């Protein structure tokens, strides 16, 4: 299957990174290389792009798309490892870092990956298929309380208690093996009126399980910190999020780096000695235009936040 993915907030990201033609840039979520191909077009032969992705299919597609460029290094890894990756490449500092935290259209549309609640497939949801831990283990082995907590916390699902209870009851008969089995269980757990209103009834639960499988939120804070430490002064970090949980983490971390002072508010001056390491380029998240949402409905919930290293 062709690796299709429409780059979200493309022009906004390119502007955000303030690309220098001889700079070094890291795309932490290379995917189909939509953003990266445009970054490379702005680089001279002295510039360099480092593309990281934990999905081998994505790396293969990116190499094909970027084959005309020689100034690219490909890394099969999780962006959580950005510090070691740059150390191994003997690159102390970079000019820009991009993270697109969305699931690619390819991953959603290829049924076999198990990300979609619209297509039947084995319960998987692994971004990195070299890992053993998948959605199957979560659905069939987590306790009811553990299921409840991830569905509530990562999916912000108001019927988390009912859904986790239904999952545990159903799997007592036989293991839950496919996405459609799970969808049916979720639908049965949610009241009919709620099913008829709002998004697909399985959307939030699938999001929660995917986040847990890939440790998406657990690694984000540390990755931002490590990335900022690797930026040159004036270097920029741009992060695209697609749901409120991610955006909240990014927003709060950016604010903390911009204002790390821990002194009580009533103190007339700072005595803790903690200095800002970044400035906020965008105070508010940048959202797609109406035109972009019409062309690519999956961009609707996207939000871009940008910081610059001091």
Curated annotation (Swiss-Prot):
Keywords annotated in UniProt: Cytoplasm, Methyltransferase, rRNA processing, S-adenosyl-L-methionine, Transferase
UniProt GO BP: rRNA base methylation
SUPFAM superfamilies recorded: Putative methyltransferase TM0872, insert domain, S-adenosyl-L-methionine-dependent methyltransferases
Residues at which S-adenosyl-L-methionine binds: 33-35, 53, 79, 100, 107
Gene Ontology molecular-function annotations: rRNA (cytosine-N4-)-methyltransferase activity
TM annotation in the entry: none
InterPro entries to which the protein is assigned, alphabetical: RsmH, SAM-dep_MeTrfase_MraW_recog, SAM-dependent_MTases_sf
UniProt catalytic activity: cytidine(1402) in 16S rRNA + S-adenosyl-L-methionine = N(4)-methylcytidine(1402) in 16S rRNA + S-adenosyl-L-homocysteine + H(+)
Signal peptide bounds: none
Enzyme Commission designation: 2.1.1.199
Subcellular location: Cytoplasm
NCBIfam families referenced in this protein's UniProt entry, alphabetically: 16S rRNA (cytosine(1402)-N(4))-methyltransferase RsmH
Function of the molecule: Specifically methylates the N4 position of cytidine in position 1402 (C1402) of 16S rRNA.
Protein name per Swiss-Prot or TrEMBL: Ribosomal RNA small subunit methyltransferase H
Species in which this protein is naturally found: Clostridium botulinum (strain Alaska E43 / Type E3)
């Amino acid at each position: 299957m062709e690796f299709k993915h429409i780059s979200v907030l493309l022009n906004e990201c390119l502007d955000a990174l303030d690309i220098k033609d001889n700079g070094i840039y890291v795309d932490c979520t290379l995917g189909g290389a939509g953003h990266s191909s445009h970054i490379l077009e702005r680089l001279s032969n002295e510039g360099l792009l480092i593309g990281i992705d934990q999905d081998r299919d994505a790396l293969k597609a990116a190499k094909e798309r970027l084959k005309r460029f020689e100034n690219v290094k490909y890394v099969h890894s999780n962006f959580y490892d950005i510090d070691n990756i740059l150390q191994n490449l003997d690159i102390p500092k970079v000019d820009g870092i991009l993270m697109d935290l969305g699931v690619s259209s390819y991953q959603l549309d290829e049924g076999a990956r198990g990300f979609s609640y619209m297509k039947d497939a084995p319960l998987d949801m692994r971004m990195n298929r070299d890992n053993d831990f998948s959605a199957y283990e979560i659905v069939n082995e987590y306790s009811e309380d553990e299921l409840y907590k991830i569905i509530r916390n990562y999916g912000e699902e108001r019927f988390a208690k009912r859904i986790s209870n239904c999952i545990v009851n159903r799997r007592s008969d036989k293991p839950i093996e496919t996405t459609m089995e799970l969808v049916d269980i979720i639908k049965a757990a949610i009241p009919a009126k709620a099913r008829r209103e709002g998004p697909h009834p399985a959307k939030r639960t699938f999001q929660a399980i995917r986040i847990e499988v890939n440790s998406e939120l657990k690694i984000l804070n540390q990755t931002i910190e490590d990335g900022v430490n690797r930026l040159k002064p004036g270097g920029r970090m741009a992060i695209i999020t697609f749901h409120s949980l991610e955006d909240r983490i990014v927003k709060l971390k950016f604010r903390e780096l911009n204002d790390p002072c821990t002194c009580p508010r009533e103190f007339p001056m700072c005595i803790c000695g903690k200095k800002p390491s970044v400035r906020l380029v965008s105070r508010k998240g940048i959202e797609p235009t109406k035109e972009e949402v019409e062309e690519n409905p999956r961009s609707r919930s996207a939000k871009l936040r940008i910081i610059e290293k001091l």
